[in-house]
Amino acid sequence: MSRILPVTDPAEAAALDRLAARDDFEARRIRRMLSMPDLSRTPGSPLHELVERVKSVPSFKDFDIIAIPEIVPASISFDLFDFPPTHPSRSTSDTYYIDEKHILRTHDTVFWYYYLQLPEIKERIARGESLGTLCYGKVYRKDEIDRRHMNVFHQMGGWYLMPEDKGNLSLDDLKSVLSDVVKSIFGPNCIYRFNVDVFPYTDPSLEVEVQVEGEWVEILGGGMPKKSVLKNMGVEGYVGWAFGFGLERLAIISMKLPDIRLLWSEDERVKKQLVLDRPFVEVSKYPSVTRDISFVVPKDFVPNNYFDLIRDLGGDLVQEVKLLDRFENAEKFGSDKVSYTFRTVYQSFERTLTSAEVDKIHRAIEEDTKKRFSATIR
């Protein structure tokens, strides 16, 4: 029987208090993202159903279920997991920093640390017991805007550890477990394969691809936890395997979902369509509205930060943002400036948008672009 192990961290509570006291753009954005529901724990959501399917895999019958903080120290997320100092995940262009030391969690694998710090788990390790854990929930990364990506999404991961002196584990053991995971999601007749991959915290590592309408699509990654990473967390003499995957990607494949935003819809007509293994049928497709914006900004401009601005002001009405052009001209703009042109596609699942309401949003985006990025609108 699985046990649920919630983890509370006073450092997270303190970070939330500091965040609540701020009124800047970034603080408001982060509070909004944290307030979004955890769909992996929302009955009726296909992401919740995916979690339940994976939990039902026989190998996980007695695994602990751990719920971890959403605000974590960057040192735990990156240093303990052997992320190189120059890894892009450490950058503010990829990760949401609460302050210099704390971030919104970027990967659910951070549960390794929190699980191993629990007093009862330390006691089990001292007794030489084997350990198994599953973890799932929201993660946060700055990302592009299109029908397949959001900056708030959900991951699920798990691992198994056993003392070295009680036997050996190999990549074949992990492949056997992952085969059961894939079949629990896509059915016993699905076609899948394993490829070599690389992750900072596992070695060797692999990825799993599943065949979808004749094409191979990556769905999850895994590997054997590096001994150096386990040692960073105070554990030696153990071997194991681990895996992790994004829930949205699997749901999109299972339902042939045309847009990731549909997973968050409160429209009952849409929610009735969100059933795993059943192709989504659009209840009504309302026309999109397109607007372009061109501006000149300093060269340290980061597009991912601009995507966040558009999300802040356009919300769920923004379907996609495309970079149409990036242009440098020292004579025209100056050697320290660069010109960008972006195209934003607006579309509602519930109604036809008017030009007037889109223009209002777009004007607000123009004004905030000037304020936040010292931009000159062209």
Residue ranges and their predicted role:
Residues 195, 200-378:
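A carboxyl-terminal module marker
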Residues 150-151, 155-174, 179, 183, ...:
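A conserved active-site cap/scaffold subdomain adjacent to cofactor or substrate pockets
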